[in-house]
Amino acid sequence: MVQSVLGSLVLGYRPLWGRERSLVGIQLFVRSDGAAQVDVAHLLHTLQEIWSASSPPLLLTPQTRQLLGDMLAHAPRNAPWICVPGPWLAESAVYASVQAAHQRGLRLVWRGELGNLPEPDIARCFDNSLLSLRPEDAVAALQAAPPARPGAPPVAPQGTSPVIDGQMYENVASRALMEHCLDQHKALALAGWPVEDVLYSLRHQQMQPAHAIILKLLKAIEAEQSLEIFEDILSEDPLLAYRFMV
């Protein structure tokens, strides 16, 4: 049965990173495979079965209005967070489904641009937001809290940051903006990571495996754990995994 319901879907994922720079959740994108009818109730039950208590929380992100409507209608109260695109709420059917789901106790996340927040009567239906930063938002945020540069005098802040405390953010393109969201405004999570900017800032440094993973591996070796345990630990660090593969 698991194979049948997952076989009718196209799935994608994106890590959600927290203030400790560790994984705090997974955004799971869900789309039906062609014209196949998706049994959403069965899908939610399957996820509940295969997702253990130690697994990171899920943010379900349906890619079609039909899937969203089915999730809002059939999800139980203890279901994962469900992401709702802000522009879709202009349709009365979607808005009515969101209101009904909120009244049933579902945890909903509004997704849209920081500069186009929902009205209060809509916002109260949502537990959190996944906000997209526009270029002008990024500029305003960094001007309000200019990042320190080694050897340079501090720059006076200009204006106030548009970043809202405690929300989730996406389209964060720079390391400085990432630190601004997570550290200064206590963002709940960052969807994705400013990979290109981080790699560029480390271009002259030789990367090393994470110290915590090395210690964990040494303890497993001392305890004479199985090869499977060693492989699991190695897989937690990309650099270690690559070195042992080659």
Regions found by a protein language model. Name each.
Residues 77-81, 103-108, 123-130, 159-163, ...:
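Glycine-enriched alpha-helix->loop->beta-strand junction motifs that scaffold or abut catalytic
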Residues 146-246:
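Conserved alpha-helical "signature site"
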Residues 90-92, 114-161:
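Bacterial c-di-GMP phosphodiesterase catalytic domain signature
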Residues 59-63, 80-90, 105-115, 127-138, ...:
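Catalytic beta/alpha-barrel core
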Residues 41-45, 90-106, 147-152, 230-234:
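Hydrophobic transmembrane alpha-helix bundles
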Residues 32, 88, 135, 173, ...:
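Flexible, active-site-proximal loop/turn residues at the rims of small-molecule/cofactor binding pockets
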Residues 70-73, 93-100, 118-123, 140-145, ...:
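A short acidic, amphipathic alpha-helical/loop segment
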Residues 1-81, 86-100:
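Bacterial c-di-GMP phosphodiesterase EAL domain
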